[in-house]
């Protein structure tokens, strides 16, 4: 194609993504758009087509983002090229959202006609506004009996401040309003602005590992053209690769002769390891490089850390390979080897949040068949030592000696909880119990309230979300962002079995709750750890001080069964002998800790 044709083609390109809170109908809308543009034949159509992982389908959530090219013939008779970039809606996967928004010019904001705006809708809208995207509101599910499109329209205008007078009323399930959405994309979303003649600049927004072709980069071309045979260079580390193939996704990968400005597609260049390709990096040509990289999206840092150990210790290498493979597609997963006296060899992994942690654990067990033990999640604490040094600690067993600690700071989050009015009391009580500080409360409409709290991240990591859902019958929606570090009175609690510390059961707790947490855990462990031949004390300790203790009684055999009557000294001799045996056993005996014991530290409910 010559330059004129390329420029004409660029004017017909529309890049957009769909943003929504979980369950507001985003993936269904994407399905309808694919059908309406006849991208996918009716034979291949299946629900949630873009959610290609089994896990995504089962949980009904979108985890990875997907990019697809569609052709749409508009009412003006012209054919437009749409690139739909599907994004996750869950708070843990915001980094996936920020990546996909960096590749777009417009966003369709889907809001449920019955539920209205939710916390994550807001979070994603702000991300879109930061990226200067044109936002098209769509009020979905208008065929529901509880739908109230006018109220939702007013909400969009009041809470977000978008003009919703032209918002499309749609039902993705029933296929209503799909055409209007497509026409709005043509009219309102701007065409890409880049320059075809400039040196190549392409933003990597995802990478996938393919066993045959190496790492495949998913890119949005901002300036210039790339074609097979070119030598590309990555701007962050200067490495060069030869392009073997470029193409687009129409869910399936289809090879093309070139990718030009405004295109969204993939580049294969036999790249061996994913560590070479950072998501958010800029690809340029080695012989005609761009002068400066694109300002990509922000690098996400893990917030939650946990140890992962294989139950069978010979699976350690398999676990490492599995984690490396997952890391290929998931730039935000971090891990490093660690050892534990109780659990053997494993890895300390960093995750963006709890759902992310859950999903990774499930994928390891499901796709790689590795049975895992996971230790209690913890966050990064800043520990200020008495000699003036400050260290970051994410693993309770690495905490320094209490005598050397001057103060400990922990991360706080700003939590936005949107909830119907009748549950405000329950939410406030929960937040208070989790050491939250009240910030402010706004009414969104007559019934819904947006409550904002500052809460320690460590409290949210445990089971805040489940508790929130159960105390509000599932009506609350929740979104959080890290706000600051504050100093807190935190202590490290060790659990001792038979006088030995079990490092994997240590956890960090606020001084006020130390006693009850300790008591709770020793009581729980007592129920879980099987009785031994000797008595086993379970203790919770802070430093040298024991704060709670309980004993597991010994199993005993009746050694007197064979004495029929007879002399009392004979019986005493047998009992003394048994006692000495038990004592010897206790001195050398070790206690098997079942997997449930580690999980019980996690589900620390005040039951």
Swiss-Prot record:
It is a peripheral membrane protein. Transmembrane segments: none annotated. Disulfide bonds: none annotated. Residues 11-193 form the tr-type G domain. Keywords: Cell membrane, GTP-binding, Hydrolase, Membrane, Nucleotide-binding, Protein biosynthesis. GTP binds at residues 23-28, 140-143. It is found in: Cell membrane. It comes from the Bacteria. Its EC number is 3.6.5.n1. One of its GO terms (molecular function) is GTPase activity. It holds the Pfam family GTP_EFTU_D2. GO terms for biological process: positive regulation of translation. Required for accurate and efficient protein synthesis under certain stress conditions. May act as a fidelity factor of the translation reaction, by catalyzing a one-codon backward translocation of tRNAs on improperly translocated ribosomes. Back-translocation proceeds from a post-translocation (POST) complex to a pre-translocation (PRE) complex, thus giving elongation factor G a second chance to translocate the tRNAs correctly. Binds to ribosomes in a GTP-dependent manner. This is Elongation factor 4. It comes from Streptococcus gordonii (strain Challis / ATCC 35105 / BCRC 15272 / CH1 / DL1 / V288). The gene is lepA.
